Amino acid sequence: MDRSLFLNTKLTDDQVALFYLGQEGFLIKHKETYILIDPYLSDYVDQNCYTETVKWIRRYPAPISAEEFDFVDYVLCTHAHFDHSDPYTLSKLAKINSKAKFIAPKPIKDTILSYGITEERFIDALADEVLELNGCQVIPVPSAHEELRTDENGDYYDLGYKIILGDTSIYHAGDCCIYDGLTKRLMNTDVLMLPVNGRSYYKRYVEDIIGNMTCEEAIILAKETNAGMIVPMHYDLYDCNRINPALFVDCLFSMNPMQKFHMFAPGEFYIVQK
């Protein structure tokens, strides 16, 4: 996978291309606008979070290096965890791409700036406050990474993003569990990108791994919101925090066999057209 794949993929005005970079990382292309979400293109977690009890070892290398993204317009981060706001990846992007703007929850602004992003290139993301960007709209949506967390001003630490590209709507949840009010925010979304690795008491309180929605919850959410398609994510990179994707497929066929879905391999792309 290299930059030519992104740049040479031809789209009609009503098409959106999704390129999978691993974990929850995606590049989205619409017309000539390029949006990176949660790019994790290093082994920062392996180097800095590995312990005797929890062994973080990537199951596959990043399909592309951060240096290839000198053309990207916007970089969106959903929260501060290193596999979503990667210091190595973000610092490289800031150096090689002078035009990119970085968007992240306002409470983690100082963290993102510490990776080499200048203040004038940072855009605060606040829940439900629409960002009018070049060629698209971005609507930040609160995410419950097991729970909803806010700072002293009531601003959310964890966000997902609903992105409107022409007539196509895409929701990237970041790390998220179901909470009251989420369904209403996501009605009739064309593509739901949802973390499906689940959660458990032992992971949370013994291994300090904060969880996400289960496969069953993701499928119910898609049905309740009348989603066009589900893209499961956050299930494949680390053995200590993944699931067998066959579980998702089995649940889907049992619970809602008519639901469209796409399961990505790292480096794969898919074109969405309504």
Segments (PLM) and residue ranges:
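Conserved catalytic scaffold of divalent metal-dependent phosphoesterases
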Residues: D38-Y44, D128-V130, G135-E146, T189-Y201
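Divalent metal-coordination and catalytic microenvironments
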Residues: I28, D38, H79, D86, ...
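Active-site environment of divalent metal-dependent phosphoester hydrolases
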Residues: Y44, H81-S85, K109-T111, E129-E132, ...
